[in-house]
Amino acid sequence: HLHDEAVQVLASGIEDITNQLVDNFKLNEVLRMVLETLYRGLHFRRVVFCLREPKLDSLTGRFGLGDDIESAKGLVAAFKIPLHTAASASVDLFAAVCQRGVDTLIADATEHKIAERLPAWYQAKVHAPTFLLLPLAMKGATFALIYADKGHPNSIELSERELSLLRTLRNQAVMAFKQTG
């Protein structure tokens, strides 16, 4: 069963990361392990890790995994999410998710009310029909984001157990930052 396999891969990745966090670890290695576990466990098409760029007060794409990521370095570079937007600015879905710090699954990004909230950079460069956003926060402020997508609308289906493991993975990434911070 697909969900059982996903749970096994996620749980095993979490265990590896836990062991890594006990040793003298390199932050980037832990982050890559988190992305790799997500990518393999849930068969995402692409995953991208974004980190706060203090000068710009926005999140920018740092690295990713998946279909075409190497040939599409432009894909990772495309991610630019403002952390503070003027109230009058059009409601950018990514900015809103990061400001609220809420895990968000967009089942069908082609739906009109969703599509009109997707930023121009996303529509031009990324343009996935379904995606998941997992913000990373410390002291109530989002400082990073994990993005994951698939190639068909409504194709990201998560059981409660998978969702719980995803959150654990995200929390491990936050812990890694706290320990190096």
Where are these regions (language model features)?
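Signal-transmission linkers at sensory-effector interfaces
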Residues: 1-28, 179
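GAF sensory/regulatory domain recognition
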Residues: 50-86
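Regulatory loop-to-helix N-cap segments in sensory/regulatory domains
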Residues: 150-169, 176-181
